[in-house]
Amino acid sequence: MNDIEYLKKYLNPADLEEGIKKLKQGIPVQYIVGNVNFYGYTFEVNENVLIPRFETEELVEKTIGFISNYFEKEINILDIGTGSGCIAITLDKEIKNSKVDALDISTNALEIAKKNNLKNHSNVNFFHSNLFSNANKKYDVIISNPPYIAYDEEIMDIVKNNEPHIALYATNDGLYYYDEILKNVSKYLNDKAIIAFEIGHKQGEKIKDLVKKYLPNTRVLLEQDLQKKDRFIFVFKDK
């Protein structure tokens, strides 16, 4: 389905002309329509949140698979940098024996996430926090799709000109948030735990090195997306 067909499907005929005008101005079709499908659920999106991508659906799918093989009890999950809430809400819906918390530094993003929580009849606990600053318990699963684009990296204009830079860019060649999370994560993990990251396709080995630096007694797995690009890091803590 191309963008015009997408507009025709989701917009009222009276709004179609204005929608096409915005499309020609370079505004993403998802922001024009105001929602996006993710893992079979519908999420409201606007310029305060990142538009969920297929790769993030893959992150969720792989994480669900690892959780089902790794835990036999009710689990506590934390989503760091939740944005629209798509990861947290999907995990809450798909993993019945779970309690899901989700945080973001952006209050505007949290407003959207809480709306999506209601619309999808999920029970995620959303709270405002700069990484772990307001987190106060331990988790079995910590998942994050943090900002990972380096400031000097070229990206498409439609992304750069519309999506929130706070959700896109990171210092330290895009590695800042991985470093901060991994540096501080130990005190928020239960004895048996999983960390799941979406990453930039050139960052895999560097993030593996960070895992070895901060969490030396864990197993780390680098996985590719459907485009055969390095895209996901999974860390398994067994004790």
Residue ranges and their predicted role:
Residues 1-239:
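Auxiliary N-terminal substrate/complex-recognition segments of SAM-dependent methyltransferases
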